[in-house]
Amino acid sequence: MTRKQRAIFEPALVRTALLDAVKKLDPRVQWRNPVMFVVYLGSGLTTLIWLAILSGQTTGSALFTGSVALWLWFTVLFANFAEALAEGRSKAQAESLRGVKKTSWAKKLSEARFDAPQEKVSADSLRKGDVVLIEAGDTVPCDGEVLEGGASVDESAITGESAPVIRESGGDFSSVTGGTRVLSDWLVVECSVNPGETFLDRMIAMVEGAKRRKTPNEVALTILLVALTIVFLLATATLYPFSVFSVEANQAGSPVTITVLVALLVCLIPTTIGGLLSAIGVAGMSRMLGANVIATSGRAVEAAGDVDVLLLDKTGTITLGNRQASEFLPAPGVTEQQLADAAQLSSLADETPEGRSIVVLAKQRFNLRERDLHSLNATFVPFSAQTRMSGVNVQDRMIRKGAVDAIRRHVESNQGHFPRAVEDAVESVARTGGTPLVVADGPRVLGVVALKDIVKGGIKERFAELRKMGIKTVMITGDNRLTAAAIAAEAGVDDFLAEATPEAKLALIRQYQAEGRLVAMTGDGTNDAPALAQADVAVAMNSGTQAAKEAGNMVDLDSNPTKLIEVVHIGKQMLMTRGSLTTFSIANDVAKYFAIIPAAFAATYPQLNALNVMQLHSPASAILSAVIFNALIIVFLIPLALKGVSYKAMSAAALLRRNLWIYGLGGLLVPFVGIKLIDLVLAALIMS
């Protein structure tokens, strides 16, 4: 799901942004943006010159100088307004999150069990390691891990999703978030953070962006903009002595004024992108939140735009994720009912969809009823990422089910033999895109349970789009190579990693990074944490464990693994917006040359009148028109900076050509039209 997006120019936000824009005139704020700080200084200088003219201390046109000074201040204010508007949208989102935080009470337990003695304490007094009981109707007082129990939890205040979710001890759905509400049953939870460090607190801090640091690309672009500003500053500074010399040599005209030089400098330096750069970064974070993804920093959003390798879990991302048992394929000498009986026993305590489907299929085929593990005096062996199998120990039987290679190792370690007929059955299931689970009883292989999964509709087309963009897709699965190859071919991914372990994921990420590539992945379990920490873009599922959320640099509140593709799109859109507006900003300097250079020097060098291709009314109106256009273009581009440029899936070279045509050519032509229209308005005002 996505959050409802606020209108860009919502009246309440605009009022707040206007006030903040004035507050940002503080020099301590302005110097952080070097390009706009030059405009800020130029505004102050022309204002002083205007005051000097009014007081008779110097000569010049008070109307012209005052008008230039006024529009230079507007340029600074418009840039401040763009940044304040972007920040205001983020702050409004943060306020809605802050409303989730309520003063609540907690039932603190003396021990980690349901019937332990309890005391009522303030949620703010809870510390990491404290254990609390949360019952139906209670607000979850802290972030933590479920130690005991299971409950239905309303997380709509955090995720925006109205459907309740199940949180229970063990597995990858054991994490609870402070501020959510338990709807039924009960949970015993161990707090995993101290006050002020909760997920909600971190969300608010991230969204507000109070301590937003510039990303590497922003820093690099800022250095480029500063370099251009210095070049234009030096070039403009040399024009004054050149003008004085030219007037004396030609005995014509008058030296160019400081006001005109300041106007020329401001129009030539990249004020458009300089004024919008910060707003673009803030808006990128805001758009990510609009997709219900919390990014820990702008660096993470930017990295998403540079990603060229996506590691995608098969289950839930590429396939629907609800694999169902469809067939029992017994080994030689084993009846189908014997295999079904053992498979059902091994799955009685397995709460996964696959495990439950095995129990149901055995019941449907052979009327095998569920049995109680306690009455059988059996011990359940849970699945782990390392062993890649689960099962049950009952009496003298050691029943295991799991991946082919895992069961093979288990059987051979017990001096058993893996039958060729079972290998053939495994290959048969795998070739059709199914997942074979092998069942063994000690050293004896009993047969194969076939699991069927379905590839999501439209996923192949999405992968084709990513391929056009130069992004490699890699499917990660615990299935054997044959199954993985069949599903990979059906889904259209570029590569796959079969029989994946946490160590294999980590090694694959490091391999791609060693090749200079940026890697993105999703994860929700504690076993995913090392790989999430290593990946350049790591999207942790909100439903996952605390360890996974701490290891990732983004959290998907919807817990939808497919969201990784949308995250990459948002990141690329932010980078494209920044690049497009930089191209536009630099390109529109050309028209300003044709406006200001003839106006400033035509009196001394009449030949320069040939450059007045726009036939502007007068030197004063030409200069003022360029300054006004330079200010207004920032306002007109604010929606584009906040929403992002339109994005289409294509190669980097094709995108570059497209943007050069739209924003490069547009940057050349739009100022000619804009400056001419403003000049016509000024001329009409002068004539009236």
Curated annotation (Swiss-Prot):
In its UniProt record, a GO molecular function of this protein is: P-type potassium transmembrane transporter activity
Q: Keywords in UniProt for this one?
A: ATP-binding, Cell inner membrane, Cell membrane, Ion transport, Magnesium, Membrane, Metal-binding, Nucleotide-binding, Phosphoprotein, Potassium, Potassium transport, Translocase, Transmembrane, Transmembrane helix, Transport
> SUPFAM superfamilies per the record?
Calcium ATPase, transduction domain A, Calcium ATPase, transmembrane domain M, HAD-like
| Enzyme superclass (EC) | translocase
Q: Where is the active site?
A: D313 (4-aspartylphosphate intermediate)
Provide GO CC annotations from the record: plasma membrane
Binding of Mg(2+) occurs at D524, D528
Q: Which cell locations does it reside in?
A: Cell inner membrane
Q: Which InterPro entries match?
A: ATPase_P-typ_cyto_dom_N (IPR023299), ATPase_P-typ_P_site (IPR018303), ATPase_P-typ_TM_dom_sf (IPR023298), ATPase_P-typ_transduc_dom_A_sf (IPR008250), HAD-like_sf (IPR036412), HAD_sf (IPR023214), P-type_ATPase_bsu_IA (IPR006391), P_typ_ATPase (IPR001757)
> What topology does the record note for this protein and the membrane?
Multi-pass membrane protein
Transmembrane stretches in the record are 34-54, 62-82, 219-239, 260-280, 594-614, 622-642, 667-687
**EC annotation from Swiss-Prot or TrEMBL:** 7.2.2.6
Task: State the reactions this protein catalyses.
Answer: K(+)(out) + ATP + H2O = K(+)(in) + ADP + phosphate + H(+)
Tell me if Cell inner membrane is a UniProt keyword of this record: yes
**Superkingdom field:** Bacteria
Which residues make up the binding site for ATP?
Answer: D350, E354, F383, S384, A385, Q386, T387, R388, M389, S390, K401
Report quaternary structure and partners.
The system is composed of three essential subunits: KdpA, KdpB and KdpC.
**Known role:** Part of the high-affinity ATP-driven potassium transport (or Kdp) system, which catalyzes the hydrolysis of ATP coupled with the electrogenic transport of potassium into the cytoplasm. This subunit is responsible for energy coupling to the transport system and for the release of the potassium ions to the cytoplasm.
Describe the family membership recorded for this protein in Swiss-Prot or TrEMBL.
Belongs to the cation transport ATPase (P-type) (TC 3.A.3) family. Type IA subfamily.
Q: What is this protein called?
A: Potassium-transporting ATPase ATP-binding subunit
